[in-house]
Amino acid sequence: MEIRPTEIKDLPLVMEIYDYARAFMRATGNTTQWIDGYPSEALICQEIEDGHSFVCTGEQGEILGTFCFILGEDPTYQQIYKGAWLNDEPYGVIHRLATNGKQKGVSEACLDWCFQRWPNVRVDTHRDNKVMQHILTKYGFQRCGIIYVKNGTER
């Protein structure tokens, strides 16, 4: 698997992956995360333009997953409740990690790529996203506390 920047021509497949991810979340008990068409095509276009959107591709170049990776402070991480960050060092943030569900190891490939770029990585997920929580725990992430994202929901 390889990671590369998302190109605008990838947008239809990336949006299909997010459609699949929303349906998967609903089917696994996560009914309140990524609602109302989130993430929107406009948001992903902006992330492509900003150089923050990436895709994970298979041996034939097929897109298997997508995510956002941003180096630098995330405004939603400035306040943490019922806990504390592990350190105050500069960090990278992973957002909107999703796969098409057709191949194992895609999430891990994306996480590996992020850690190769920056050793201090933060990620948040919804309390009902048990699948992502399992992946993050397996990968060695530790729960640090609660943050609130832009729409006011807890992570």
Residue ranges and their predicted role:
Residues 99-116, 133-138:
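Conserved acetyl-CoA-binding loop-helix of GNAT-fold acetyltransferases
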Residues 68-102:
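Conserved acyl-donor/pantetheine-binding loop and adjacent beta-alpha core of acyl/acetyltransferases
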Residues 124, 142-155:
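Conserved catalytic-core motifs of GNAT/GCN5-like acyltransferases
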Residues 128-146:
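Conserved active-site alpha-helix within GNAT-family acetyltransferase domains
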Residues 2-16:
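A short beta-loop-alpha structural element at the N-terminal edge
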Residues 22-42:
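Conserved GNAT-fold acetyl-CoA-binding loop/helix
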Residues 117-128:
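Conserved GNAT acetyl-CoA-binding A-motif
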Residues 55, 62-73:
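Conserved beta-strand in the GNAT
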